[in-house]
Amino acid sequence: MRDELIRIVECYLDGLKNKDLSKVAFASDVTFEGPLSPKLTGERAVVEFLTGLFPAVKDVRVKQHIVEGEYVATLFDFDTTFGVIPVFDCFRVSNGTLKQIRPFYDPRPITNPQESSEGHV
């Protein structure tokens, strides 16, 4: 069970990295809620939003997965045109599909690139 949940999450992360979400098993009512977006509901809305990120994506490097029940928390480095952004993503996997995606990260490299490059905290 644990390995299957991780496989589903890694398919999503590989999809971001390779700029191709066609193999990702999204639930039809998947939700995505991040620091810079309102809560999105439905596969079409989520895929549309994520596809908009593709031009900024350079790499995704997974550091760790933590699995409990149907939840997977994944720590990864999101290498983007804004720099490397450490992300802690909380996923809910239900019936073999991604049901919830909730990323947590510091948005300053995106919202204020000058400030983050100067090292202000």
Name the predicted role of every residue range.
Residues 1-121:
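C-terminal and inter-domain tail/linker signature
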